[in-house]
Amino acid sequence: GSEMCIRDSSMAELAELANACEMEVVGSCVQHTQINKAIYVGPGKLGQIREEAEELQADLLLFNDSLTPSQLRNIQDDTGMAVMDRTTLILEIFASRAKSREAMLQVEVARLQSLLPRLVGLHDALSRQGGTSGSMSSRGSGEKKLELDRRRAQSRLTELRRELAEMETERRTQQKKRARSAIPRVALVGYTNAGKSTIMNSMVMRYLGDAEKTVMEKDMLFATLDTTVRSITPKENKTVLLSDTVGFIDKLPHGLVTV
């Protein structure tokens, strides 16, 4: 029924995301039961995945969901393979595509927000294993390093958010100036890779006739993360500002919504 269609669509989208990250998909499988808190899928299914991955000579296991730090670690330990979840994959794509300073900072914030819970989870696991009280002097070297990494990540997040807040203030000022100019703004919105850039380019060529002002078109999810604005005049004395935007996608990491 509809649930199966949604699942198939989501898996097809994951394959496209993998291709966008220059990965070759060699196999896939679906589990219908509830999520296993320890290893995401059931023990039998994970064993099947491990065997099929070995037969297919796969280098990476890619999960169509966000994994918890413990799930990620347990799956890696059980299979002996590199493991990536959907959130990390999308973050990798955004990191490789971001061009503007603001987009790069936003991607870094999202990556750090994704990393911090993993550092905290590993830190807690080490604390339980060692039975430490929490003071730096009583901790092992691995636990101390995790604590330092966590503090550095928190400090960097604070710094990035401060810089992004300054950029947001500047952008709001520019938006107010544009609002006073009374020029209408039109944004092309829709799913990623749905053809927004194609529409943008057809309008640019029709009303501007300048190929240098077209945007990149590529049959790939998130081919570009930069919003492009062009001033066009579809009717005499009726100028509009046309924007090509980053597209929508399912399960987008919350920290990337503003990119």
Task: State what each model feature region is.
Residues 27, 60, 81, 239-240:
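Hydrophobic "anchor" residues on beta-strands that sit immediately upstream
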Residues 19-37:
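Short beta-strand elements in bilobed, periplasmic/extracellular small-molecule ligand-binding domains
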Residues 133-143, 147-254, 258:
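Conserved G1/Walker A P-loop phosphate-binding module
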Residues 1-6:
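Short, small-residue-biased leader/transition segments that mark boundaries at the very start
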Residues 47-121:
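Accessory, often N-terminal, substrate/partner-engagement and coupling regions
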Residues 8-16, 26:
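Terminal alpha-helical anchor/extension segments at protein ends
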Residues 9-12, 35-51, 224-227, 246-259:
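Switch II of P-loop NTPase G domains
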Residues 97-160:
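Long, charge-rich intrinsically disordered scaffolds of nucleic-acid metabolism proteins
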